[in-house]
């Protein structure tokens, strides 16, 4: 049989033997070389069918179509009479993908990039794509200064036309900057200019995280920094003429040279605003005022443009265009700024939508909105909604997106995109100290119950000295106006002796109800009523305790430690909160002030009042809010009314993870001074340091904390980026260095009567500590670790350097 052979093998272009103008009619099509690809699939990809008359062009199109499927690396077309014989060589299938030597780039990231290029297990191997990936990865290494890096793809054949693909990396070392030169600078020294760069050719010995590694992206950023530095100081003609980056022969060193032209300094002669101002010319004019003789400043010009856009955005102009054109007069060295404004269309809000709130109900988010559907768009109202969502503490991130409605010239949708965090926490605390040993506490809190926004807490403690249970529920939107309603039930069996406090037992239970009233965006008031029953027993005679009992008309014996006393109190509870933090957890900017207090009302056995003031202020010191200074204070004071004293069990305490770290919880402040026991049940274990008078025991000092009716605590904290934590988890982990100080005192202590004992009425006995803290928003809830070293303490204070707590952040 005579066979006329046509051979065509090309990846992109094909050629065929000419069959003549009339061609031939295909009566059958046969394939050779198919393994993975089905015959039917191959036929469907061909433009030629049985019965078609074909010519050279049809054959070429067939070749191209088969190559376009990506399944073949070679295609041959043969004619055997009226039969078309297609011989193919399939591309091998990737059986596995592995990596070797990659340290700077993680395997997961490499796999994602490969899959984005169509390279994955089970797919055909495209050698052209692999070559492009090799080059792309090498370019990446070059951009971060690793010029000796190489990436090679190793393809290992396997049976059944399969291959193993292995990318072998030789990353090498990062080239270090040997010198940065700036040529053409006269007004500023090179050192002064380089001090604002991210890249460095010298690193001080104390900068343990600094390096001299070169990165292309950082150089681009530094050039913009250099440009802004000059433009902000009046150099309107400043120009970067060229930049050279030179490698040493061993590719380990880099020299960077930046050639600039400074030009002269220019002053602003005026600002002229024109265009479509949408009737807000007077307000825009206020934003463009300049001081006579003011130097041209590029940053101020940009800020002015942004301020005009924000102003128009508040009135519904969602997409204004503002362009500033400096008109430079070289003769008198002045710049006249011409600002062209096009407000564009004014937009209504058609819908407000929420994305990412898988747990939180839409209504919980919608009630925080200040922008209304159907109203003019207000960018400030949209931003207020974002702030309020952040302050809820339910979300890791909140972003907004204003989307135009297709086909409408004046409508937009506002989309809030949230990333929810775990708002429930299992509170479990462990502390260890040189004197205290190990201590525990536990509880459960859910701030967004079933996505309704309700805060529900069930807390319980069971240890050697306390059995405590509490149920609390708060509805933040009891009314549509934002009036909140909260309630609490609790039971507490507390044996102070076993807690290293003054010796007594108190079994109490009670309830309270509180209403919260929003005043404006940042202020709210609270008011409520409470009831508590206290049953005191096993009260060992102690000066401050007996002083309270005497004020209540009780005269227990100082030789009896089995005294008991019961009270029923009704209280009016009140509070005020100012909250302008940027978000509900891990804030980075703003402040919060919380004032709480209570006073007994008629029908109570006790008569007293108690006030606590907490403040926190966050001040970011960089634009990204990664470096933040935090200042916190806590003030407390209480006293009796009508000649009575405030109950000793209502005293303030300090020490522990929420006040002065490095000290055991509640141990800072006045210590118990006991009367000597004469009864038959006298326990010699309570015989501490007893003074004598006329041969008889007088009073006994101890290390048992009793608290006081006044407290002052302050903390200064420096929040820093957490080392070795990627940006993905930066919002979930916080590291800080702190300095805590605080004191507790008793204003009713009579130092003249007890001259031989410490003056517990002196507020100047301030304790201090310093240390480091780590907070993590874990799946279990917030975890807080701290290590603090007390450096100012007094006799009787108990240190607890390491403290660990789940369930509390600040």
Swiss-Prot record:
| POTRA domain residues | 24-91, 92-172, 175-263, 266-344, 347-421
Q: Does the keyword Membrane apply?
A: yes
Compartments annotated for it: namely: Cell outer membrane
Q: Where is the signal peptide?
A: 1-20
Please indicate which superkingdom the organism of origin belongs to.
Answer: Bacteria
| Biological process according to GO | Gram-negative-bacterium-type cell outer membrane assembly; protein insertion into membrane
- Which is an annotated Pfam family here? POTRA
Which key words tag this protein in UniProt? Cell outer membrane, Membrane, Repeat, Signal, Transmembrane, Transmembrane beta strand
**Under the cellular component aspect of Gene Ontology, which terms does the record hold?**
Bam protein complex
Task: Cite the InterPro entries for this sequence.
Answer: Bac_surfAg_D15, BamA/TamA_POTRA, D15-like, OM_assembly_BamA, POTRA
Subunit field text: Part of the Bam complex, which is composed of the outer membrane protein BamA, and four lipoproteins BamB, BamC, BamD and BamE.
User: What is its biological role?
Assistant: Part of the outer membrane protein assembly complex, which is involved in assembly and insertion of beta-barrel proteins into the outer membrane. Constitutes, with BamD, the core component of the assembly machinery.
Q: Of which family is this protein a member?
A: Belongs to the BamA family.
Recorded protein name is Outer membrane protein assembly factor BamA
Give the species.
Answer: Escherichia coli O81 (strain ED1a)
């Amino acid at each position: 049989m005579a066979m006329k052979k046509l051979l065509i093998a090309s990846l992109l272009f094909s050629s065929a033997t000419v069959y003549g103008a009339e061609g031939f009619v295909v009566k059958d099509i046969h394939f050779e070389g198919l393994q993975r690809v089905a015959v039917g699939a191959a036929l469907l990809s061909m433009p030629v069918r049985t019965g078609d008359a074909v010519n050279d062009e049809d054959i070429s199109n067939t070749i191209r179509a088969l190559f376009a499927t990506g399944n073949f690396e070679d295609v041959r077309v043969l004619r055997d009479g009226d039969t078309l014989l297609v011989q193919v060589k399939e591309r091998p299938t990737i059986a596995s993908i592995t990596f070797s030597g990659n340290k700077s780039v993680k395997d997961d990231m490499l796999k994602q990039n490969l899959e984005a290029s169509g390279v994955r297990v089970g797919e055909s191997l495209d050698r052209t794509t692999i070559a492009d990936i090799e080059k792309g990865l090498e370019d990446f290494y070059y951009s971060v200064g690793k010029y000796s890096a190489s990436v090679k793809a190793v393809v290992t054949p396997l049976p059944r036309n399969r291959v193993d693909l292995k990318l072998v990396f030789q990353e090498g070392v990062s080239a270090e900057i040997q010198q940065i030169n700036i040529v053409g600078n006269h007004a500023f020294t090179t050192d002064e200019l380089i001090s604002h760069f991210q890249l460095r050719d010298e690193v001080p010995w104390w900068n343990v995280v600094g390096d001299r590694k070169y990165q292309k992206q950082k150089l681009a950023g530094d050039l913009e920094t250099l440009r802004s530095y000059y433009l902000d100081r009046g150099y309107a003609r400043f120009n970067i003429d060229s930049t050279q980056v030179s490698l040493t022969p061993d590719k380990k060193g880099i020299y960077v040279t930046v050639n600039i032209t400074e030009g002269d300094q220019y002053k602003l002669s005026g600002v002229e605003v024109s265009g479509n101002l949408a009737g807000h010319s007077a307000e825009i004019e206020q934003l463009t005022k300049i001081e006579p003789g003011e130097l041209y400043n590029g940053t101020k010009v940009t800020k002015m443009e942004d301020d005009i856009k924000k102003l128009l955005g508040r009135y519904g102009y969602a997409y204004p265009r503002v362009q500033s054109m400096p008109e430079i007069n070289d003769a008198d060295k002045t710049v006249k700024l011409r600002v062209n404004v096009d407000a564009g269309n004014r937009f209504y809000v058609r819908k407000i939508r929420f994305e990412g709130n898988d747990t939180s109900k839409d209504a919980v988010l919608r009630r925080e909105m200040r922008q209304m559907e159907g109203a003019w768009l207000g960018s400030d109202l949209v931003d207020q909604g974002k702030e309020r969502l952040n302050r809820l503490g339910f979300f890791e991130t909140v972003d907004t997106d204003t989307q135009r409605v297709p086909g409408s010239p004046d409508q937009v949708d506002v989309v809030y995109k949230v990333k929810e965090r775990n708002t429930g926490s299992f509170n479990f605390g462990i502390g260890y100290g040189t004197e205290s040993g190990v201590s525990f506490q536990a509880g459960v809190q859910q701030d967004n119950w079933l996505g309704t926004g309700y805060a529900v807490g069930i807390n319980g403690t069971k240890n050697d000295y306390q059995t405590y249970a509490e149920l609390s529920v708060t509805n933040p939107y009891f009314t549509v106006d934002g009036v909140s309603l909260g309630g609490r039930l609790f039971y507490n069996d507390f044996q102070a002796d076993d807690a290293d406090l003054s010796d007594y037992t108190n079994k109490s239970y009670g309830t309270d109800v509180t209403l919260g009233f929003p005043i404006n965006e940042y202020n709210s008031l609270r008011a409520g009523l409470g009831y508590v029953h206290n049953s005191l027993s096993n009260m060992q005679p102690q000066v401050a305790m007996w002083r309270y009992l005497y004020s209540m008309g009780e005269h227990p014996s100082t030789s009896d430690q089995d005294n008991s006393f019961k009270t029923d109190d009704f209280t009016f509870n009140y509070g005020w909160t100012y909250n302008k933090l940027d978000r509900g957890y891990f804030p980075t900017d703003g402040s919060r002030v919380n004032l709480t207090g209570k006073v007994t009302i008629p029908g109570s056995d006790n008569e007293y009042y108690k006030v606590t003031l907490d403040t926190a202020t966050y001040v970011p010191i960089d634009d990204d809010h990664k470096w933040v200074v935090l200042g916190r204070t806590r003030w407390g004071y209480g006293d009796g009314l009508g000649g009575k004293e405030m109950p000793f069990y209502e005293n303030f305490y300090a020490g522990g993870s929420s006040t002065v770290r490095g000290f055991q919880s509640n141990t800072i402040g006045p210590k118990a001074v006991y009367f000597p026991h004469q009864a038959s049940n006298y326990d010699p274990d309570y015989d501490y340091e007893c003074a004598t008078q006329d041969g008889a025991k007088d009073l006994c000092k101890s290390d048992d904390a009793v608290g006081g009716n006044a407290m002052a605590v302050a903390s200064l904290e420096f929040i820093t980026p957490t080392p070795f934590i990627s940006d993905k988890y930066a919002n979930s982990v916080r590291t800080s260095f702190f300095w805590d100080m605080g004191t507790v005192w008793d204003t009713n202590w009579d130092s003249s009567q007890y001259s031989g004992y410490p003056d517990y009425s002196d507020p100047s006995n301030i304790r201090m500590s310093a240390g480091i803290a780590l907070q993590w928003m874990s799946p279990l809830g917030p975890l807080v670790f701290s290590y603090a070293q007390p450096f100012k303490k007094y006799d009787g204070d108990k240190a607890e350097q390491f403290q660990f707590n789940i369930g509390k952040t600040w």
